[in-house]
A protein has these predicted regions:
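Gly/Pro/Ser/Thr-rich low-complexity, intrinsically disordered segments predominantly at protein N-termini
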Residues: 1-176
Length: 176
């Protein structure tokens, strides 16, 4: 009887991954100074590390979320499973109910209710449009975008809002 074909994905160097756990365990990937995500084909996609302003805004946004929302969990660098691979969310907020359903998975099978992307100069509008759509498809209620100047945009599936529905007093500018 012939052997079954290999089911794991291979990159150009022949390295293989089948799950996000495989990506996390890969010793070569752990040493790279890049943000790592996967695409819909299971291939690893690397981005340059974020710049200093991004690194300053990320914890500020996380603290502000904790200040403006209670009864949930704020996460940073959260791997979220989407229809087009695992995406690394900059900041997110899970309700206690949603968090309880996730368990101890190495990636979240559902998006947090609030997903925040902090833009870097390397991000394109098309890339952010796609991520926004993927987060909504994965269960996000709101997607927030923080521009390179710190301007906040609050989006729901049906369009942009002037404020967040869950955190209406959240500032529309994140200064650093």
């Amino acid at each position: 009887m012939p052997e079954a074909p290999e089911t794991k994905r291979r990159d150009a160097s022949g390295r293989r991954w089948d799950t996000w756990d495989d990506v996390q365990r890969d010793p070569l990937l752990r040493e790279l100074p890049f943000k790592i995500e996967t695409n819909q084909h299971g291939q690893v996609v690397m981005s340059p590390p974020p710049g200093f302003p991004h690194s300053l805004r990320q914890p500020r946004i996380a603290r502000l979320l904790e200040d403006h929302l209670s009864g949930g969990y704020v996460v940073t660098e959260c791997p979220v499973k989407t229809a087009k691979g695992t995406k690394g969310l900059d900041v997110g907020w899970f309700s206690s109910e949603r968090r309880a359903k996730i368990g101890d998975s190495s990636q979240s099978p559902v998006a947090p209710e609030i997903c925040v992307e902090i833009l870097s100069p390397s991000n394109t509008e098309a890339e952010m449009d796609e991520k926004r759509a993927l987060y909504f498809e994965a269960g996000a209620e709101e997607v927030w975008l923080c521009s390179t100047e710190g301007d906040m945009r609050f989006l729901e599936a049906d369009g942009e809002q002037t404020t967040s529905q869950r955190a209406p007093d959240f500032p529309d500018q994140i200064d650093v």
